[in-house]
């Protein structure tokens, strides 16, 4: 991308960058302080190309960061936006204000806008850096802008530092020149009630399920929605249609690959986005400007460009729109001194899917109820909400099938 394009790329204006930084910092702080309160930045809830950047935030006052926490968060910002390539990383440690951090990111992007990094949980549950050519992200952003050119406003119910939120909550509205309203603090049914003609609601299946289940009034005319991060169940599509949603776009993609396919109806298969080429054997996808993308799910092909998603290939399961890894949760459980062994499995289906755990106490005479009460807050300090087992069963041995293999319970 040329320097001229970079200088005028609307998504790199400070008001957009501040929103991304606020979400990124909040996530990093949740990782560093499991179970702690979420930080609050006094930023405008509505952002547009014309908006003023908004109130500044003193990171020391808002977050009370220790030196190691500050270093961790600053490193994440540097790696994501490429500040370290131009010696701008040191500025984050000296000037601990959100305004300065945003201006530093903008300066870095003016110097080098060749790629952008996002982080995926990957196959092991540990954050993994995924680098995307900026040209590929711009191409995808322009594709969605053409599909959604008549939208007047975005209601954003997802964080904008993840790739889905960046594409639809930052790049799309900045490209179209329309405002974005952050609606994450509002109950999902209220978001539907507040939607106006021409709005695009950017959410995920869990959000839309709650919104549709508790909504008590029809939607305004000409409201659209986009959903991603996991397949949206048919009943959610149906409920939203009954409420008067005019159209819904479902995007299938991953942090590693960005958008892969899309569909406009629950009964339809996904159609590959135009730039993807299927490799022989159909196990990998290719595009000219990036490495091959290996599917994280099992697909069945309808024809040369359309496919259906059957489920996860790796050990990850989708809980509330997030990838979680039962093996990692099990590792945390068995690190508790009162736990001799454990197994963790998903239960439920679709958007109601959660984790359950079976625990073998280190002390055979341990009181099961007391151990359960001890584990719940202990796990809350070490696991994200989506990772925490909703059921904890306790017994003398792990469940087995008659053949001696690990069993369900």
What do the predicted segments below correspond to?
Residues 2-50, 73-76, 116, 150:
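Thiotemplate assembly-line natural product biosynthesis machinery
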Residues 61-94:
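Phosphopantetheinylated carrier protein domains
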Residues 86-100, 104, 383-406:
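AMP-binding/adenylate-forming catalytic domain of the ANL superfamily
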Residues 105-119, 149-153, 245:
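Conserved pre-ATP/AMP-binding loop-to-beta segment of ANL
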Residues 115-142:
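Conserved AMP-binding A3 loop
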Residues 139-153, 161-199:
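Conserved AMP-binding/adenylation subdomain of ANL enzymes
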Residues 213-267:
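Gly/Ser/Thr-rich phosphate-binding loop
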Residues 298-387:
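AMP-binding/adenylate-forming catalytic core of the ANL superfamily
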